Amino acid sequence: MSKFRSLADIRRDYGELQLSEESAENDPISQFKLWFDDVLLNEKNDPTAMVLSTVDEKGYPDSRVVLLKGLENGNFIFYTNYQSAKAMQIQKNPYAALNFYWPQMARQVRVRGRVKKISSEQSDAYFSSRPIKSQFSAIVSPQSQEILDRISLEDALNQLIEEYGQKPVVRPENWGGYMIIPDEIEFWQGRDNRLHDRIHYYRHGHEWTHRRLAP
């Protein structure tokens, strides 16, 4: 007998948390901040982790986990190499989706919107706040390109550290931040018996409107 359970039999109860139209905030950013405060208290691992989805020139979707590094003026901010695969896809198709999933609270937030680079000043400020070895890694890594092996990458990192010594590290031009300007945000609260709560916010002109969706 296989020691693995059937995938179809894997399930769990989601608990008693709920999301109603009456309790939902009028705008999704306020609702996100409310939930995120709860998440910081209850989620043990990577509460800022989010799946970023983009589309390449052939229409193929790509997804990867990145970290939320800011929520400014209602925009979701992350950082990356501007020559990475995700950056090339954003350049050709400046729209993306985010998916936050917090299993301890059975909560999910989906975001869809436009993508823009943030200012150089913002990227400089964040880059200088990173641990020094993370700064060097951003310089030495040709992200998404083929490399010979890990040892050559580590050798390049060590050489760069030796060359810089105590000098301040300057952010490379090919590294910085993006903001996702949301047009839609959906909040999902897992409920027992699979009758989940879904509240969907969408822009209506300059205002936000929300509605309940069937699970």
From Swiss-Prot:
Keywords annotated in UniProt: Flavoprotein, FMN, Oxidoreductase, Pyridoxine biosynthesis
Top EC group: oxidoreductase
Obligatory cofactor(s): FMN
GO biological process: pyridoxine biosynthetic process
Cofactor binding notes: Binds 1 FMN per subunit.
Listed pathway(s): Cofactor metabolism; pyridoxal 5'-phosphate salvage; pyridoxal 5'-phosphate from pyridoxamine 5'-phosphate: step 1/1; Cofactor metabolism; pyridoxal 5'-phosphate salvage; pyridoxal 5'-phosphate from pyridoxine 5'-phosphate: step 1/1
Enzyme Commission code: 1.4.3.5
Residues involved in substrate binding: 11-14, 69, 126, 130, 134, 194-196
InterPro entries attached to this UniProt entry: Pyridox_Oxase, Pyridox_Oxase_CS, Pyridox_Oxase_N, Pyridoxamine_oxidase_dimer_C, Split_barrel_FMN-bd
MF terms in GO: FMN binding; pyridoxamine phosphate oxidase activity
Pfam family, one: PNP_phzG_C
Catalysed reaction, written as an equation: pyridoxamine 5'-phosphate + O2 + H2O = pyridoxal 5'-phosphate + H2O2 + NH4(+); pyridoxine 5'-phosphate + O2 = pyridoxal 5'-phosphate + H2O2
Entry binding sites for FMN: 64-69, 79-80, 86, 108, 143-144, 188, 198
Keyword Flavoprotein: yes
Transmembrane segments: none
Subunit text: Homodimer.
Role played: Catalyzes the oxidation of either pyridoxine 5'-phosphate (PNP) or pyridoxamine 5'-phosphate (PMP) into pyridoxal 5'-phosphate (PLP).
Family: Belongs to the pyridoxamine 5'-phosphate oxidase family.
Protein name: Pyridoxine/pyridoxamine 5'-phosphate oxidase
Species whose genome carries this gene: Legionella pneumophila (strain Lens)
Taxonomic lineage: Bacteria, Pseudomonadati, Pseudomonadota, Gammaproteobacteria, Legionellales
